[in-house]
Amino acid sequence: MFLLYEYDIFWAFLMISSVIPILAFLISGVLAPISEGPEKLSSYESGIEPIGDAWIQFRIRYYMFALVFVVFDVETVFLYPWAVSFDILGVYVFIEALIFVLIPVVGSVYAWRKGALEWS
């Protein structure tokens, strides 16, 4: 027989964490003042009057470096719990973590050889 009452805390947390953002959006939509005008439609540049066009194009190189950074940053976050409990997990989990690290490394070597990470 399944003991579903063990998951009551999980379901309560899930419902509370779903209701709070919805309530926050609803309350801010009701209480926020509605103001329309040229000030609302202009772009914000650190409190000074905007100069020139706000829509400028960025090179795709910025996005490539940002994506590589995010991939390795998320990988580091996922590897931290493994590193904390490394001594009790065993060799099998070590091999899995090695494969987990190897996949982004192979991907970045591929991108490097294709010239996606060249800044010129």
Curated annotation (Swiss-Prot):
GO BP of this protein: photosynthesis, light reaction
Subcellular location: Plastid, Chloroplast thylakoid membrane
Main location: plastid
Cellular component, GO annotation: chloroplast thylakoid membrane; NADH dehydrogenase complex
Transmembrane segments: 9-29, 64-84, 88-108
InterPro entries noted in UniProt: NAD(P)H_OxRDtase_bac/plastid, NADH_UbQ/plastoQ_OxRdtase_su3, NDAH_ubi_oxred_su3_sf
Signal sequence segment: none
Presence of keyword Plastid: yes
One Pfam family hit: Oxidored_q4
Broad EC category: translocase
Keywords: Chloroplast, Membrane, NAD, NADP, Plastid, Plastoquinone, Quinone, Thylakoid, Translocase, Transmembrane, Transmembrane helix, Transport
Catalytic activity annotation: a plastoquinone + NADH + (n+1) H(+)(in) = a plastoquinol + NAD(+) + n H(+)(out); a plastoquinone + NADPH + (n+1) H(+)(in) = a plastoquinol + NADP(+) + n H(+)(out)
Superkingdom per UniProt: Eukaryota
Membrane topology per record: Multi-pass membrane protein
Annotated EC: 7.1.1.-
GO molecular function: NADH dehydrogenase (ubiquinone) activity; quinone binding
Subunit and partners: NDH is composed of at least 16 different subunits, 5 of which are encoded in the nucleus.
PANTHER family: NADH-UBIQUINONE OXIDOREDUCTASE CHAIN 3
The name this protein goes by in its record: NAD(P)H-quinone oxidoreductase subunit 3, chloroplastic
Organism for this UniProt entry: Nymphaea alba (White water-lily)
